[in-house]
Amino acid sequence: MSQRLTDVLQRLAATIEARKGGDPSVSYTAKLLNDPALAAKKLGEEAVETVIAAVAQGSDALAAESADLLYHWLALMAASGVSLDAVAEKLEAREGTSGIAEKASRA
């Protein structure tokens, strides 16, 4: 992953966090943060749109939908109170483990 993407995602996550407590009537992000179920629904919609872009719309559409997907994922994590460090911890625990073995360990 490029440092550029890391930096952009960190800024976006900080912006989302700053919207907590904001007015949902004027901030889409605040609206998502106030309603984790809505944030989850929007993430699902963006996931489907990302898949469609990947198989039928080309690389520019895939990049645009991926940006929407990442934004909505970050919003859902914030709305649900799950830190990105918690996600990093899970990913680190899986490093070096075969995907099949790792998945079996969660069953």
Curated annotation (Swiss-Prot):
Signal peptide: none annotated. One of its GO terms (biological process) is L-histidine biosynthetic process. Pathway: Amino-acid biosynthesis; L-histidine biosynthesis; L-histidine from 5-phospho-alpha-D-ribose 1-diphosphate: step 2/9. GO terms for molecular function: ATP binding; phosphoribosyl-ATP diphosphatase activity. One of its GO terms (cellular component) is cytoplasm. Keywords: Amino-acid biosynthesis, ATP-binding, Cytoplasm, Histidine biosynthesis, Hydrolase, Nucleotide-binding. It is found in: Cytoplasm. SUPFAM superfamilies: all-alpha NTP pyrophosphatases. Belongs to the PRA-PH family. This is Phosphoribosyl-ATP pyrophosphatase. The lineage of its organism: Bacteria, Pseudomonadati, Pseudomonadota, Alphaproteobacteria, Caulobacterales. The gene is hisE.
